[in-house]
Amino acid sequence: MKLLFPILLLTGSYFLSACNNTQSLMSSTHTIAASDPHIQVMGRTHINDDASLTFGYPGVSLSTIVAGSRLTAEMQSSNGNSWIDVIIDNHPPTSIKLDAQQQTVELFHFPNSGEHRVEIIHRSENWHGQVTLKQLTLTGTQFLPAPVLPQRKILVLGDSVTCGEAIDRVAGEDKNTRWWNARESYGMLTAKALDAQVQLVCWGGRGLIRSWNGKTDDANLPDFYQFTLGDTGQAPQWDHHRYQPDLIISAIGTNDFSPGIPDRATYINTYTRFVRTLLDNHPQATIVLTEGAILNGDKKAALVSYIGETRQQLHSNRVFYASSSHHPGDNSDAHPTKDQHAAMARELTPQLRQIMDW
């Protein structure tokens, strides 16, 4: 009986110590660089010397799974005009505008620790600014193995429509970068329907041979296809071995035809050379050419004809055509609306299923 009190005291001390250790473990912090393998990346990114990631194309997505109560990200936008969507456990997204200076973005904060899946999606496009993700910091137990991407791979090449411009338009509001929403674009919706990962490589206002205003000295599709981000001679060049798509969709031509129907031979010869580059760089890929959603009437008919002759010149059983209906936007903006993007995906998906036998 004399030993009972010391034993109980020792036992109580043990449980108190264990409880404190558990609380300490649950409240500890863990920081990983953006290029850490616990973060799954979809889209073109540039790995910097400090292991951070910089990206500019829309739809770039970074996802991770963690056990903890709070997760933050150190991020910035070079121009302060970029937006991201943050999705926690498949709940509706939260849209966040990034500053030009590095900021701490709180991705989630819960009273209790638990397992959570987190996804960051770049809503904006290159000319809004390049986004840098430096690191993630977790309050909790650990970063778990990263989510696995679908095996099928799609590359979508295009202009502002592919970038998701004006999907989130607001009637009566001056147009701003909040209106872009790559997540709801036809390309990402189509990839989701086909159970595929996707890269959007697109630039608003650009075309195959000229921009919307007729300029020919901008970086148009054959140029910016080669970039990781940016559109100047100093832009990091993309290593095509990093991503070998099964399917490439080229939806270009709206801006080429905006000033008028371009010279037939110039357009077809340029498109033929570019598609040959795609065939060489991606020897296992099927390539689908489409006219996009904005053109109508004579311009649409001319572009469809140019695409047909491009295919004839290539003589390749890997190059196909997919048709697109006219989706004219609304009174707020000529770009397709959110509902029209969904309709575009519904139109495109069965054509691609048949071509790919998916």
From Swiss-Prot:
Known pathway = Glycan degradation; xylan degradation
Gene Ontology CC = plasma membrane
In the bilayer, the protein is annotated as: Lipid-anchor
Residues carrying the lipid (S-diacylglycerol cysteine) are C19
Enzyme Commission number(s) from the entry: 3.1.1.-, 3.1.1.72
Q: Which positions are lipidated as N-palmitoyl cysteine?
A: C19
Q: Which domain of life is it from?
A: Bacteria
Which residues catalyse the reaction? S160, D333, H335
| Swiss-Prot/TrEMBL catalytic activity | Deacetylation of xylans and xylo-oligosaccharides
* Compartment(s) of residence: Cell membrane
> Which InterPro entries is this protein grouped with?
CE2_N, CE2A, CtCE2-like_dom, PCW_deacetylase/CE, SGNH_hydro, SGNH_hydro_sf
GO MF entry, a single one = acetylxylan esterase activity
Question: Which terms are listed as keywords in the entry?
Answer: Carbohydrate metabolism, Cell membrane, Glycosidase, Hydrolase, Lipoprotein, Membrane, Palmitate, Polysaccharide degradation, Signal
Q: Which CDD domains match?
A: Endoglucanase_E_like
Q: For the site Transition state stabilizer, which positions are given?
A: G205, N255
A UniProt-annotated Pfam family: Lipase_GDSL_2
Recorded hits in PROSITE patterns, A to Z, give: PROKAR_LIPOPROTEIN
Q: Which residues form the signal peptide?
A: 1-18
Do you know which SUPFAM superfamilies this protein is assigned to? SGNH hydrolase (SSF52266)
Instruction: Look up keyword Signal and say if it applies.
Output: yes
Biological process (GO) annotations held by this record are: glucomannan catabolic process; xylan catabolic process
Instruction: Say which family it is in.
Output: Belongs to the carbohydrate esterase 2 (CE2) family.
What is the role of the protein in this entry?
A: Involved in the degradation of plant cell wall polysaccharides. Catalyzes the deacetylation of acetylated birchwood xylan and glucomannan, with equal efficiency, and of the synthetic substrate 4-nitrophenyl acetate (4-NPAc). Does not bind cellulose, cellohexaose and beta-glucan.
PANTHER family, per the entry:
ESTERASE, SGNH HYDROLASE-TYPE (PTHR37834:SF2), GDSL-LIKE LIPASE/ACYLHYDROLASE DOMAIN PROTEIN (AFU_ORTHOLOGUE AFUA_2G00620) (PTHR37834)
- What's the protein called, per UniProt? Acetylxylan esterase / glucomannan deacetylase
Q: Which gene encodes it?
A: axe2C
